Design a protein with these regions (language model features):
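Well-formed, non-transmembrane alpha-helical positions, independent of function
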Residues: 22, 63, 86-87, 169, ...
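Structural detector of well-ordered beta-strand residues that form the stable sheet scaffold
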Residues: 4, 72-74, 94-96, 136, ...
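Short beta->alpha connector loops
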Residues: 9-12, 34-38, 55-59, 77-80, ...
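Short acidic active-site motifs
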Residues: 38-42, 58-62, 83, 179-183
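Rossmann-like dinucleotide/phosphate-binding beta-alpha-beta segment
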Residues: 128-186
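N-terminal glycine-/charge-rich "phosphate-binding" loop or analogous flexible N-terminal tail
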Residues: 1-49
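Phosphate/diphosphate ligand-binding glycine-rich loop within oxidoreductases
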Residues: 31, 50-127
Length: 186
């Protein structure tokens, strides 16, 4: 069985080494297609792959049509927006993703951007602290929860709106829940 990792923007060496260890210990072959610049390279590489791992690379109907042995496609990340699920289904190819995989990195980036903007690095000497400020979080999923925890650690007042998460759960985590989305943005 051949597992293809195809990424225009490569995974870290540590991630590839981890994938390689798992794949080879299972007795399978790992193939890498990194930094490809032509979709034909992707078509050629996927032709004999049994499994495909991608990041945000587009797995279109055309890619699927070039995959003669493909049984599974794994998107390293949340969502399926880059996978043609209808094409996968038509060929009985399992499509999976890894929700939450990068949640902490995304939450850290959000906090980092808040710090950057609060310090007003565009005009040195005019910045402020985040402590005591209010942050509004639109969606309280994996990333939203982590942003809330990090913001609270910085002394921020955290508000969040998510119609799919019970108000009691958010309040139990010290988050203020506005009645409407409009109130969050007010």
């Amino acid at each position: 069985m051949k597992v293809l990792v195809a990424t225009e923007k490569p995974f870290s060496k540590a991630a590839v080494d981890g994938i390689r260890t798992i794949v080879e210990e299972a007795g399978y072959e790992l193939a890498l297609l990194e930094k490809y610049t032509d979709v034909q390279q992707f078509y050629d590489a996927v032709a004999d792959a049994d499994a495909l791992i991608v990041r945000s690379d587009k797995v279109t109907k055309e890619v699927i049509d070039h995959a003669n042995n493909l049984k599974i496609v794994v998107r390293a990340g949340a969502g399926f927006d880059n996978l043609d699920l209808a094409a996968c289904t038509a060929k009985n190819i399992v499509a999976m993703n890894t929700p939450g995989q990068n949640s902490n990195a995304v939450a850290e980036l959000a906090i980092g951007m808040m710090i950057y903007m609060a310090r007003n690095t565009f005009k040195p000497g005019t910045g402020c602290e985040l402590s005591g400020k209010r942050v509004g979080i639109h969606a309280y999923g994996n990333v939203g929860r982590l942003v809330a925890a990090k913001a609270k650690a910085l002394g921020m007042e955290v508000w969040a709106f998510d119609p799919f998460v019970p108000t009691e759960k958010m309040e139990a985590e010290g988050v203020k829940v506005p009645a409407t989305l409009e109130e969050l943005y007010a």
